[in-house]
UniProtKB/Swiss-Prot annotation:
ATP binds at residues 119-125. It comes from the Bacteria. GO terms for cellular component: cytoplasm. This is UDP-N-acetylmuramoylalanine--D-glutamate ligase. The keyword Kinase does not apply. One of its GO terms (molecular function) is UDP-N-acetylmuramoylalanine-D-glutamate ligase activity. Pfam families: Mur_ligase_C (PF02875), Mur_ligase_M (PF08245), MurD-like_N (PF21799). InterPro entries: Mur-like_cat_sf, Mur_ligase_C, Mur_ligase_C_dom_sf, Mur_ligase_cen, MurD. Pathway: Cell wall biogenesis; peptidoglycan biosynthesis. It comes from Enterococcus faecalis (strain ATCC 700802 / V583). It is found in: Cytoplasm. SUPFAM superfamilies: MurCD N-terminal domain (SSF51984), MurD-like peptide ligases, catalytic domain (SSF53623), MurD-like peptide ligases, peptide-binding domain (SSF53244). NCBIfam families: murD (TIGR01087). GO terms for biological process: cell division; cell wall organization; peptidoglycan biosynthetic process; regulation of cell shape.
Length: 456
């Protein structure tokens, strides 16, 4: 990593003891900062707190007392999940204390080129594709995944060498806290309305996403989804070289034409060879192809890698086949748009959808067009009655109810026939029955595994 002196003897407050906060605290301590870590949980609820104390890092737990700011911190490194409306954070802004996120630290110490990926949907899948592509055809160095994908960016940046590529998934929450962060390649998969409770308005949300390119120059490349007019308009305001991708037209970049994927008129592969279904995954693949071509990955390696890629866990992930029924886990679909995208990749006449979850107060009328023609729908959770109303509007004849995901799998399997597909894509958050979407997805996969074992 780069040896920087920026933080020597500087008083820094790290807010939040999640993985990224612990990583940031340790890095700042190593760089000579006087670090205090603050977390809302009690000390005994933070497994890393004792380790930080042992290093000589001060730890304050059990709340975010505003009085902490009286200690005249020169910088705050904020966990992305802590909103700017938090009283301590709001007061820090009033006092004009600089606030950054951990990805800014990673960018400051990284020796290697950075590939940054953001967007409303498809970030994790695209980031994973890019990592696999860059590692498939390299002469030196390694593509190292980091950021919102689950690996603290500041830890990975310390480990990466100058020959590597730091491939970072970046959320809008993380991008709100960057100042000098400078990717050499940046990808925006798409922008839809999301996280307005955090950002306050769509304008602020878009601004956070667009911040990924604010330090880029004409020597850098910004890869944009040309299907979206909004991104075409924003493209006129960046200093970076713009490389588009599109499923609607041939562009000077990556595109879909007559069922085939191209890059600048160069044939890459048939779209139907992609290992994961859905029009949204064609977009993700095109974005990844752009990065791969910039990094000189061969067409043969691109085709082989994307054909073999079976998806990221809980994101239209192929789980297996039981008695000629195919099962897909899309538990990450925690909103209507994500489920619409998942459904676009399947033949509804042979599809049984498993959906439902936390009731956030919205109706599901906008999901109706995507539900048309479904063979059956199995509903669970707080929203099952609302989803049933949407299913009726879509003229779905078979509407079934289940207690939870596990029983939904059994009910769907019993109703299905050979060559059918059973898809978990809930269109809702999981918190009414499961602690997170991962646990919900694991429950689905375990139920499928039990079906497999029962036929042995």
């Amino acid at each position: 990593m780069k040896k920087i002196t920026t933080y020597q003897n500087k008083k820094v407050l790290v807010l939040g003891l999640a993985k990224s906060g612990v990583s940031a605290a340790k890095l700042l301590h190593e760089l000579g900062a006087l670090v205090t870590v603050n977390d809302a949980k009690q000390f005994d609820q933070n497994p890393d707190a004792q380790d930080l104390l042992t290093l000589g890092i001060r730890v304050v737990t059990g709340g975010h007392p505003i009085e902490l700011l009286d200690e005249e911190f020169e910088l705050i490194v904020k966990n992305p999940g802590i909103p700017y409306t938090n009283p301590l954070v709001a007061e820090a802004l009033t006092r004009k204390i600089p606030i950054i996120t951990e990805v800014e630290l990673a960018g400051q110490i990284a020796e290697c080129p950075i590939v940054g990926i953001t967007g409303t949907n498809g970030k994790t899948t695209t980031t994973t594709m890019i990592g696999l592509l860059l590692n498939a055809d390299r002469t030196a160095g390694e593509a190292r995944l980091a950021g919102n994908i689950g690996f603290p960016a500041s830890t990975v940046a310390q480990e990466a060498t100058a020959k590597d590529n730091l491939v970072m998934e970046l959320s809008s929450f993380q991008l709100m806290g960057i100042e000098t962060f400078h990717p050499q390649i940046a990808v925006i998969t798409n922008i839809f309305e999301a996280h307005l409770d955090y950002h306050g308005s769509r304008k602020e949300y878009v601004a956070a996403k667009w911040a990924i390119q604010k330090n880029m120059t004409a020597e850098d490349t910004l890869i944009l989804n040309w299907n979206q007019v909004e991104l075409q308009t924003l493209a006129k305001t960046t200093a970076a070289n713009v490389l588009p991708f599109s499923t609607k037209e041939a562009v000077e970049g990556a595109y879909l034409l007559d069922g085939k994927l191209y890059f600048n008129e160069e044939y890459i592969m048939p779209a139907d060879e992609l290992g994961i279904p859905g029009s949204h995954n064609i977009e993700n693949a095109l974005a990844a192809i752009c990065v791969a071509k910039l990094k000189n990955v061969s067409n043969a390696q691109i085709r082989q890698t994307l054909t073999n890629f079976s998806g990221v866990p809980h994101r239209t992930q192929f789980v297996g086949e039981v008695q000629q029924r195919r099962f897909y886990n899309d538990s990450k679909a925690t909103n209507i748009l994500a489920t619409e995208m998942a459904l676009s990749g399947f033949d509804n006449q042979k599809l049984l959808l498993l959906a439902g979850g936390l009731d956030r107060g919205n109706s599901f009328d906008e999901l109706v067009p995507a539900l048309l023609g479904l063979k059956a729908i199995v509903l669970f959770g707080e929203t099952k009655e609302k989803l049933a109303e949407a299913a009726k509007k879509a003229n779905i004849e078979t509407i079934l109810f289940a207690e939870n995901v596990q029983t939904a799998v059994t009910i769907a399997f019993d109703y299905s026939e050979k060559d059918d597909t059973i898809l978990l894509s809930p269109a809702c958050a999981s918190w009414d029955q499961y602690p997170n979407f991962e646990v919900r997805g694991e429950a689905f996969m375990q139920a499928v595994q039990q079906l497999k074992e029962s036929e042995m």
